[in-house]
Curated annotation (Swiss-Prot):
Its EC number is 3.1.13.-. The lineage of its organism: Bacteria, Bacillati, Actinomycetota, Actinomycetes, Mycobacteriales. Binds 1 Mg(2+) ion per subunit. It comes from Mycobacterium tuberculosis (strain ATCC 25618 / H37Rv). GO terms for molecular function: 3'-5' exonuclease activity; identical protein binding; magnesium ion binding; nucleic acid binding; RNA exonuclease activity. Homodimer. It is an enzyme of class 3 (hydrolase). This is 3'-5' exoribonuclease Rv2179c.
Amino acid sequence: MRYFYDTEFIEDGHTIELISIGVVAEDGREYYAVSTEFDPERAGSWVRTHVLPKLPPPASQLWRSRQQIRLDLEEFLRIDGTDSIELWAWVGAYDHVALCQLWGPMTALPPTVPRFTRELRQLWEDRGCPRMPPRPRDVHDALVDARDQLRRFRLITSTDDAGRGAAR
């Protein structure tokens, strides 16, 4: 199963602190959560302007501990299932680190969770940079961005048998 995801985070060149994560499965399921453990005081001006205002109110049940987000993702990704898990993100290096850190060190990742994220931006370039529709108006909301990544994947791979050859 392919999973398209995005994270919002605070980074200072030394650490990456998860703010929120959105994941969209190819079968239409969606997951979104905001970490109760990030420190908004550490956010730079860009994150304060473009990310924090888009978060749900702190009383929302979408705000969850990192431990609960990890448990939710284990269920959402069906880590005990038989389908292989493919993670996809647009320029996903920091997203992958933010995701993996939910389990602690990378060695603590469940065996079925990939140690890498497939790069949607690279796939787009490899396919000749096909024209994409404009980004949604509410970008930098992790779930909105994850939905947009699935849409982009489908557009990029629409000529190769419904995307089955995307990872070649």
